[in-house]
Amino acid sequence: MAGALKKTMIYLGLADGDEYDEQPRAAEREAAPRHEVVEARRPAEPDTDPHMEAVRPAAVRDPEPAERPEPVTPSGSTAAEPVEPRRPARPEPVDPGYRAPVTPIKRAAASSAEGASVHTLSTVHPRSYNDAKAIGESFRSGVPVIMNVTDLGENEAKRLVDFAAGLVFGLHGSISRITSKVFLLTPATVDVVGAEQGESSVADSPFDGD
């Protein structure tokens, strides 16, 4: 680009052509010493020593493979022989008439209260009307009561019989006369076998029928 501009200026007469010719020459002069310096910096090749040429490295041999030791068999022992697999034992034929022994297990007999006869009776010998509480508690618990009023006077015996009649009426039971002064009070849930049933009435005297 700069060279074309200078040529144009020389062509127009604005620049001197000698200066243009001297500039490439000066550039060549500056480049020449540089080339010499570069050549001077090259190291001199060393002289070859004839003894060095004679010496050659010995060839490196590959290491020989190590020998594998043979397996040593201990003295007095023989090589193991292949073991044949054992065959499963055949099941012995079973006698069709054989039966395994059975041990019977004893079971406790189940006790059931349903349908069982009543073996418990409560016998009361009242000495006063205050013993009516014991009669009422036994009858209310479902136990038949035999009431013997022979040790009471007529008035107290009548009061106690009236109390028993009201008791069995309120609890839907029954009262029956065994003797003139002995009465059986039966709850509604109990059936006494062998006793004659009679109607209970507070108006009846315990001494009727004597």
UniProtKB/Swiss-Prot annotation:
It is found in: Cytoplasm. The gene is sepF. GO terms for biological process: division septum assembly; FtsZ-dependent cytokinesis. Residues 13-101 are annotated as: Disordered. Keywords: Cell cycle, Cell division, Cytoplasm, Septation. Cell division protein that is part of the divisome complex and is recruited early to the Z-ring. Probably stimulates Z-ring formation, perhaps through the cross-linking of FtsZ protofilaments. Its function overlaps with FtsA. InterPro entries: Cell_div_SepF, Cell_div_SepF/SepF-rel, SepF-like_sf. Pfam families: SepF (PF04472). Its main location: cytoplasm. GO terms for cellular component: cytoplasm. It comes from Micrococcus luteus (strain ATCC 4698 / DSM 20030 / JCM 1464 / CCM 169 / CCUG 5858 / IAM 1056 / NBRC 3333 / NCIMB 9278 / NCTC 2665 / VKM Ac-2230). This is Cell division protein SepF. PANTHER family: CELL DIVISION PROTEIN SEPF (PTHR35798:SF1). Residues 22-70, 83-93 have a biased composition (Basic and acidic residues). Homodimer. Interacts with FtsZ. Belongs to the SepF family.
